[in-house]
Amino acid sequence: MAALSSGSSAEGASLFNGDMEPEPPPPVLGACYAGSGGGDPAIPEEVWNIKQMIKLTQEHIEALLDKFGGEHNPPSIYLEAYEEYTSKLDALQQREQQLLESMGNGTDFSVSSSASTDTVASSSSSSLSVAPSSLSVYQNPTDMSRNNPKSPQKPIVRVFLPNKQRTVVPARCGVTVRDSLKKALMMRGLIPECCAVYRIQDGEKKPIGWDTDISWLTGEELHVEVLENVPLTTHNFVRKTFFTLAFCDFCRKLLFQGFRCQTCGYKFHQRCSTEVPLMCVNYDQLDLLFVSKFFEHHPISQEETTLGETTPASGSYPSVPPSDSVGPPILPSPSPSKSIPIPQPFRPADEDHRNQFGQRDRSSSAPNVHINTIEPVNIDDLIRDQGVRGEGGSTAGLSATPPASLPGSLTNVKALQKSPGPQRERKSSSSSEDRNRMKTLGRRDSSDDWEIPDGQITVGQRIGSGSFGTVYKGKWHGDVAVKMLNVTAPTPQQLQAFKNEVGVLRKTRHVNILLFMGYSTKPQLAIVTQWCEGSSLYHHLHIIETKFEMIKLIDIARQTAQGMDYLHAKSIIHRDLKSNNIFLHEDLTVKIGDFGLATVKSRWSGSHQFEQLSGSILWMAPEVIRMQDKNPYSFQSDVYAFGIVLYELMTGQLPYSNINNRDQIIFMVGRGYLSPDLSKVRSNCPKAMKRLMAECLKKKRDERPLFPQILASIELLARSLPKIHRSASEPSLNRAGFQTEDFSLYACASPKTPIQAGGYGGFPVH
């Protein structure tokens, strides 16, 4: 540390006293200071000296970064020097700010700031060998008292925005250009990522980074320009009355009469017109532009995409930055152009390396819905936030107790057995008949009644295997699907959690959900559902490549959204929604299946339950891949998976088909660098469906819509599509199915009209 400080001090002394003599203040800076306070002429000189000290300190920090920045584990002496220089830089910047404010106020500042000046001077002399006189106070209090106080002049930066607009932002220390201009750009429908910022130097525009400190640009003029290959258009608003369920894109409230842009589809109330973005931005092409630029400047090496063979005992994952961050994580640095890259490879846990990316599990007809215990009020709160007023009865009694709190909790088990039915029966008469009927109802409502004894199910051929079990075709009062779960010798806690989740599954009844018929615990845990004769949506789209019409594809999406809306209304999170788990009957009726319970999908340690990565990576939301939260699965994670299903429907192919590396997909999607390419959708795909797909695939979880709003949008789209009706002039006999030979049996000559004059030529006239 001493050697490093002495070397830095020698370099600083040579910069100030040797080869690089500090230049006098520039005329612009001196004129600005002279006109601001009119005080002692030594003040601008001191400010100039402090600026030179700041510049010198930054050069030392940059030298340290160039020397040790590329090392994963830099020496401790480097970290100590780094902290010392950054703290010194903060002190110098604070002193500069005090001088500028004092010059603007025209008040006495030498006494109040002498302590800070001495501190800066002493710290500078200890490490940089700079004379304390360079930071000494030259101001005479009596001279300042003779000047009349003037209003302070705040440091500002003038900014010229696109479309001949301009604004002024304050030049605050420690605030980046991005943060200073973010609000002004958002009000104009722009984001920093689609623009470039320039500064004017010597009559030429020179680009600067968005992370540059705005205080370094005090008094300058910045120009913000839209990137060349970012498509921007103006809105095309029309007044519209929405006779079907619609929501304002700004306030998310119900919309009946308002306006709609014919280009981008933005709809809003008249009172929300002031908040509408001024430009139409094609965010789909914008995402593609960012991804292409990222691959150009940030190639992914093999080391970054390598999966770890083992996982930590805690089940946690390495930290991954949020999806809206760009670039690898870096140490904070005061220099905008230097950073310390610290590569952190993303290593998901418990991956089976034997399964290659190209090998996919066969579809099974067993449902795979995770019962994630969410309070009934949460779905209402989320729907209210999205502007949807949900209706329906309370779901009390349908929510299971959180699996993590189940073991050893007798009160939780009792609370689960409470339901509105038995409570009403207890209020009835105490006669023996009522009591017997109450017992009958209670027996029928208990989860034990859904347990199928061992030996009643005849297990047939093996259909396929999934991530957490194997599916067989069986016989139990008809054809059923039996999914044997991969749980051997379950503990009492696991068994109780499994029964609690079954208590919720047994109450699911919907036309678009596979019917749950029962479960068994011997010889192993298994769930029994109805048998589906049709094939999965994955089989139709990617195996036999069935060519569906657009109206059929939209109807499949509508039924899927309808089934998911029902599950979410029951506080059930699917967790593994994908085209393999969506089944189509011969009449194209959608059935959502593949229930994989939380008891099976979670990792148990003793009596405690931990979440683990489950499902197929192509349908996983970024927050699920990162696994930073204790329970990343939510209604919005199902919405993201539904967005991938929409992508399959509208393109006929899987996302990221151009990337063959499974680990690279996990890495890129988890960090928010990769999104499905929406430019591959079919040419006849409606714009509303494409917008809905983009909203469902938002990288930020809270920005995705919920299924009530999704279902309303798809139903509106389905009703708006043109339909070809049967011609009214078609012969009714052909519609009845008669053939040509049916008429030949009754063939007869058709009468002809007489054509002779008068019409009576064939008859004698008397």
UniProtKB/Swiss-Prot annotation:
Zn(2+) 2 binds at residues 248, 251, 269, 272. Keywords: Allosteric enzyme, ATP-binding, Cell membrane, Cytoplasm, Kinase, Membrane, Metal-binding, Nucleotide-binding, Nucleus, Phosphoprotein, Proto-oncogene, Serine/threonine-protein kinase, Transferase, Zinc, Zinc-finger. Residues 155-227 form the RBD domain. The active site is at 576 (proton acceptor). ATP binds at residues 463-471, 483. It catalyses: L-seryl-[protein] + ATP = O-phospho-L-seryl-[protein] + ADP + H(+); L-threonyl-[protein] + ATP = O-phospho-L-threonyl-[protein] + ADP + H(+). PROSITE patterns: PROTEIN_KINASE_ATP, PROTEIN_KINASE_DOM, PROTEIN_KINASE_ST, RBD, ZF_DAG_PE_1, ZF_DAG_PE_2. Zn(2+) 1 binds at residues 235, 261, 264, 280. Its EC number is 2.7.11.1. It comes from the Eukaryota. Residues 303-313 have a biased composition (Polar residues). Residues 1-36, 104-128, 303-373, 386-454 are annotated as: Disordered. Its cofactor is Zn(2+). A zinc finger (Phorbol-ester/DAG-type) spans 234-280. Transmembrane segments: none annotated. GO terms for molecular function: ATP binding; MAP kinase kinase kinase activity; protein serine kinase activity; zinc ion binding. The modification Phosphoserine is found at residue 750. Changing residue 750 to A: Lack of phosphorylation. In quiescent cells, maintained in an inactive state via an intramolecular interaction between the protein kinase and N-terminal domains. Following mitogen-mediated cell activation, binds via its RGB domain to active HRAS (GTP-bound) which releases the inhibitory intramolecular interaction between the two domains. This allows the MAP2K1-mediated dimerization of KSR1 or KSR2, and BRAF which activates BRAF. The modification Phosphothreonine is found at residue 753. It holds the Pfam family RBD. Protein kinase involved in the activation of the MAP signaling cascade. May play a role in transducing specific signals in neural cells. This is Serine/threonine-protein kinase B-raf. It comes from Gallus gallus. The gene is BRAF.
